UniProtKB/Swiss-Prot annotation:
GO terms for cellular component: chloroplast; cytosolic large ribosomal subunit. GO terms for biological process: translation. Pfam families: Ribosomal_L14. Belongs to the universal ribosomal protein uL14 family. PROSITE patterns: RIBOSOMAL_L14 (PS00049). Binds to 23S rRNA. The keyword Transmembrane does not apply. This is Large ribosomal subunit protein uL14c. Its main location: plastid.
Length: 122
């Protein structure tokens, strides 16, 4: 459950290390984002000499949350951290690698490029 002012780790090699959510997309009164939702965030920490700099506004898709998501078969998936992958306007990731596991629900949300780059899909 990601809301405004939430910090997320960046799970790709786009250059950002941490982003802070400033808006959850998908409606004017939408408060929370879950796995597969698109957010707008600001880069709070970045790697030197990379394309994304501190204080840049970016779009990102949430790939891991500490809040568990419940599946149809009753299973709950929960991760150790909140993480996102930086995307462009078309929904393609800015980085070329994705670190750590991602949830299978991303495939249902048409983020197949992120799923194919991930080392593990849970």
């Amino acid at each position: 459950m990601i809301q405004a002012q939430s910090y997320l780790n960046v799970a790709d090699n786009s250059g950002a290390k941490k982003i802070m959510c400033i808006r959850v997309l998908g409606g004017s009164q939408r408060k929370y984002a879950a796995i597969g939702d698109v957010i707008i965030g600001v880069v709070k920490d970045s790697v030197p000499n990379m394309s994304l700099k501190k204080s840049e506004v970016v779009r990102a898709v949430v790939v891991r949350t500490c809040k568990g998501i419940r599946r149809e078969n009753g299973m709950t998936i929960r991760f150790d951290d909140n993480a996102a992958v930086v995307i462009n306007k078309d929904g393609n990731p800015k980085g070329t690698r994705v670190f750590g596991p991602v949830a299978r629900e991303l495939r249902d949300r048409n983020f197949t490029k992120i799923v194919s780059l991930a080392p593990e899909v849970l």
